[in-house]
């Protein structure tokens, strides 16, 4: 019932997602921020101070979502931007990878900007992972053949399955299906510069784990498109 109330509130948005996107992009332009591309957008509800216990007023991603006063909430769109190279955006969130010998955890998260737009205008702005581009290490690098990337992914899925400790007598068959694959950019530790990061092309895979057709969870893997190394989460 409460979820339906939130959906009805969000259905009252008076502008299109594209119109909101143009407003968010105008904010970036006005601030002189370039080199960012849209990676995600979603409907949400913004609450003013005192209308929701969550500090940022978004009412997202926690139990505080259900404590907001919808009579005071404003529906809108939340836009997430990240570093973009020739139209290809970066991974906005850290992704957990199995700890293997060729796993490289970036020293800090990918730079992202989140902007919430309502009918009253901008209600939320957050800039995470602010960074400075020092130099370009190399250009026009050759990517690893996709067949080798697939082999790396298969290894990672096997490591995950092996970690479950399923006994030899257990006949339960776990299924792993790749439901999404996308080429993006992300950070990896810079060679001999542990406090710096390289922005590198990477394959982002979403793998669905299921039993007998019943989905259990979705797993995310990030594999460096240049050398096949596994990239872990920035903590």
Regions of interest found by a model, annotated:
Residues 105-199:
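Charged, low-complexity helical/coil segments in non-catalytic cytosolic or luminal regions
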